[in-house]
Amino acid sequence: MIRHRLRLALSAAPVTATGRRTRSKTAPRRSLSTQQTQSSASSSSNNLDGDGRAFVPLRKQLKDESKAKRLTGRGKRSKSASSQVEGWELTVGIEVHAQLDTDSKLFSRASAAHDDAPNANVALFDLAFPGSQPWFQPATLIPALRAAIAFGCEIQSVSHFDRKHYFYQDQPAGYQITQYYEPYARSGALWLYPHDGIAPEDGDAVRVGIKQIQMEQDTAKSQELPSHTVLLDFNRVSRPLIEIITLPEIHSPATAAACVRKIQALLQSCGAVNTGMEMGGLRADVNVSVRRTGQVEQHGYEGVSGLGQRTEIKNLSSFKAVEDAIIAERDRQIAVLEGGGKVEGETRGWTIGSTETKRLREKEGSVDYRYMPDPDIGPVVVGAELVERLRTSMPPSPDELLRMLTQDPMYMLTVEDAKPLIELDDCARLEYYLDAVDSLVVLQRDAAAAAAASAASTVSATGKTVGNWVLHELGGLFSRADAAWDGERVPASSLAAIVHLVGTKQITGSTAKSLLSTVFAGEHGGRTVQEMVEQDGLLLRPLAQEEYVSMARTVMAQHPQLVEQIRQGQQGKIGFFVGQIKRMGERGRVEAQRAEEAVRSLL
């Protein structure tokens, strides 16, 4: 059933209005003193700053700074980077902001494409022109609902939008439209397991509650030049986001990073998003607090009480940044409290390669943001029929796929092999693997039918063997060629044919790898695998046992000292004789196992 649902999800048109799969890189926002909006032409054609110096992108500056710190030893990881600090309890809550996979923006019909020129996709409302009105785009709701279903949330039949007021250069209206009071989804959960990367002390599973998921609009992308000039790209304004708010139920940095990683995987698997943290499509804010073990403090949030004073670290753009920033802030708060100080509620920042967080501003509360219902946007009404239709069309989750690949008798992969198939190439490698197993099953059935009449060799290749070839042999070819995954380069049926031939001992393992390389390089001349094997004389000619023994006797007579060493217990040297026998026989036609058996019989 899961396999069938996977096929439908990957091949059939989904019940959604998803857009093109485009990618963009998002530079971190910084607090700047001057603002300037420039067009695509001026920002792309001029690579000099206002003082005539070469312009260096902010992301490259940060990477260079991080590298310099590592070289000088100033960027070393905290000595207390373990998951726990004796005598202290860490508590973390996470807010994940994810860009939805849609064609249009949330409140205008402007394109939500990621790779267009700066300020090319901007409506009047995006720039807060006087008199412009928000126009909610219903299609943006579909991927948001898919995300809520993936987290097992209770989808609200009616939700409303609110205004969150603040003044910053990336928000021209002076407020952000979000869903503070009545979000569209509540009360979900996320389960984390050891294979997700949780801390060992968290045991076999961790349940992280999802308080709510709300839709909201994104802000502009800002870029600071060295001359105190700020470039603003309003393409990103009003792109649809969802904010996933977890309960503060995480108690280790590693588990917090695993939580964000699992959230991204779920969002991608259900088709809600098409870019992750690595491309700027997902950002995380973390709330960090500490308290002495067993002590009840006076603070709390999201319905959880008894916590220490929390601080919020904004705009973390990688899984490692999530873990490292939490470690640094935990250590800072513990040092403050042990020194007799008081942790202040504030918003802090984290820089790549840093060893400490930095204060940005005092932590705002709901009163500071002056939340109010947006009078220009009506309620969002979601019917039960739509929710059920989306629910039944959902593809299997990563956990369901993992169970299928590791527990189904047809596959029986290890967790270490199953996870890359699920996580790599947007499931394209997994689909290729399933096709290859299907093709191999057909070949096995044909061979079994022929065996009843001609006593053919028994087929022993399994889904586990196919997994090894897909991940390691074929994956290695792509890696060495520095090429992106392309299943058409070696059709799944061709790989299955190679695995079948070597599994039935019609060709040797080295011949199989050579065939795979030939097909990968496109040097097969349009021939099938079977035609290459037959026409190039690659079929394994079975040697009689007497021939193996004769070759073994010859090579052993040439190395009597090695024979004596093996008899004295140095069994590893048998491989030398096997190699010599393979060289004596016709190239690629000696079975290593039978050669070893012949050597052992003479010992």
Curated annotation (Swiss-Prot):
The keyword ATP-binding applies. It catalyses: L-glutamyl-tRNA(Gln) + L-glutamine + ATP + H2O = L-glutaminyl-tRNA(Gln) + L-glutamate + ADP + phosphate + H(+). Keywords: ATP-binding, Ligase, Mitochondrion, Nucleotide-binding, Protein biosynthesis, Transit peptide. Pfam families: GatB_N (PF02934), GatB_Yqey (PF02637). One of its GO terms (biological process) is mitochondrial translation. The keyword Transit peptide applies. Allows the formation of correctly charged Gln-tRNA(Gln) through the transamidation of misacylated Glu-tRNA(Gln) in the mitochondria. The reaction takes place in the presence of glutamine and ATP through an activated gamma-phospho-Glu-tRNA(Gln). Belongs to the GatB/GatE family. GatB subfamily. This is Glutamyl-tRNA(Gln) amidotransferase subunit B, mitochondrial. It comes from Arthroderma otae (strain ATCC MYA-4605 / CBS 113480) (Microsporum canis).
